[in-house]
Amino acid sequence: MGAEIPAEIHPTDTHSIPESGLYYSDASCELFPDKPLTPRGHVVVGQGGGFLKALLSGADERGIEIRTGCPVTDLVQDGEGRVTGVVAKDGSKSKRIRATKGVVIATGHFNENEEMVNRHIPMVKRNPRSVATGHPSALGDGQRMAEGVGAEMVGMGDISPSMYTAGAETSIHSMMVNLRCQRFWSEQGYTNNFRGTRLTQQPDHQGFAIFDEKIRATFGEVDAAEAEFKADTIEGLAEACGLDPVLLARSVERYNQLCETGVDLEYGKHPEFLDVISEPPFFAMPLAYVWMTSGAIRINENAQVVKPSGEAIPGLYAAGIIAAGRMGKQNPGSGYNMMWNFYTGRLAGRTVAAEGESE
């Protein structure tokens, strides 16, 4: 939007957000060589709180009352199946609140609902270092209530994973292997979201970033502290990690050959990041991912919640992450969730505002 990105930006996708709110979001994977990607990135002042402040101000101007500590437990339908309101808990009492135009579900993920996680996405427990990301209130109430009135649910068995190490610089110069000591990624691929997806395709969703002292010396203090396993030989490092020493030594030897030629014939890693792993001691950093659920409610072009037949459920709408269509098994990139939240929220709001009062 014409904003100038200042010189304080970090040259790679390892960064902290500067005061300006503008930063470099790395585009290291050029899908089309003749159309190079453009460095980009923007965070509003105050980050998420900045959005909320503006929205709350708009609500105050319009006299909209926002009730907190009043969780909705059920949807209310009339005899014809129209959603006419909700049941909410206000302290120790339950009360019915009538919705004259409609109910919009915008409750997000079910990351924090252990029963739903165990039922729909038990695979996230395979890597003990992987953790859910999101708010503690992401309990799946919206999914439960919508399903209870016949809504079609989408992607309940999917997650959106984002691999994390101590930083992008940590992984980009290393060699990543799975539990079978097989390299499975270019290490530099665009965004942690794509790296996370590749990790979930490996045995037990686990792996290690392997590197040597030469590479470790380039890390910051936090990165270096995350190097959990250390040994004077590759075989010794494998034993410390519970990997096969012969297989890991073979994989490192193959990787070093690629580094020496400067051409990654396996995954196309840029020559700048092909560093021979040869200077002891050697290190291994366990790979993990943060995840969020993708399970959502099917909506139509008007943000109306629909049944498996495609028929809209009168009076019921969904917006934000809980509205299907945002993504499937893969988050397409940074900032996408926010754009989907604003788009579907505005769509649902306009549709509901145009509704006549329910009978």
Label for each model-derived stretch:
Residues 1-94, 114-115, 261-281:
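Conserved redox-cofactor binding core of oxidoreductases
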Residues 46, 90-163, 338, 347:
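Glycine-rich loop(s) and the adjacent beta-strand/alpha-helix scaffold that form part
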Residues 77, 177-178, 184, 299, ...:
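Hydrophobic alpha-helical segments, especially N-terminal targeting/anchoring helices
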Residues 145-152, 241-244, 249-252, 259, ...:
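Internal hydrophobic alpha-helix adjacent to the cofactor/substrate pocket in enzyme cavities
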Residues 159-170, 189-196, 290-294, 322-338:
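Glycine-rich phosphate/pyrophosphate-binding beta-alpha loops
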